[in-house]
């Protein structure tokens, strides 16, 4: 992107407290870039909730991976940790949390579970860009997080999305894919 896009990325890095902020033309493209960056291969599984926009699952299908649907908590509508754990198999590559209605997923439990099973976590925070989890912005505690900038979201640029990560390698891969 040009100088204004780069300026916007730097501002997002400062605001969200992330090492890298990477703009994309849509949040769907952001999810596709995030999934590609973690090295998903055909047949790999990514655990996600069906309680979200279809882009969360279709971005998984873009890489010929398989979305595995886990239940949600009734109070937050975010992933239920016990359901996520019950759905982990030898084919599971990642967990995609969906922060929704201003609620953050239980990131301590998700990251602990991911570490236990050597999985990556992608946080789809399109519906909760200002939500806090232990004084940190939702989306910044996962390996990769991101936000929709669509015209009907809290922060908008007309269209687009922004990925955040603190991992240099993942950031470079996402820049190549976008």
Located regions from the model:
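Conserved core segment of the aminotransferase class I/II
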Residues: 151-178
């Amino acid at each position: 992107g040009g100088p204004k896009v780069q300026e916007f990325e730097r501002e997002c890095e400062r605001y969200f407290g992330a090492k890298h902020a990477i703009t994309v033309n849509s949040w769907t493209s952001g999810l596709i870039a995030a999934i590609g960056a973690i090295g998903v291969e055909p047949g790999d599984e990514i655990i996600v909730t069906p309680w979200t926009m279809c882009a969360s699952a279709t971005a998984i299908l873009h890489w010929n991976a398989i979305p595995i649907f886990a239940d949600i908590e009734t109070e937050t509508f975010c992933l239920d940790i016990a359901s996520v754990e019950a759905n982990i198999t030898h084919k599971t590559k990642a967990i995609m949390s969906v922060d929704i209605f201003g609620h953050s997923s239980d990131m301590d439990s998700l990251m602990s579970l991911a570490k236990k099973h050597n999985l990556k976590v992608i946080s789809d925070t399109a519906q909760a860009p200002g939500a806090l989890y232990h004084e940190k912005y939702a989306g910044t505690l996962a390996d990769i997080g991101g936000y929709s900038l669509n015209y009907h979201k809290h922060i908008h640029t007309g269209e687009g999305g922004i990925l955040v990560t603190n991992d240099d390698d993942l950031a470079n891969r996402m820049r190549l894919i976008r």
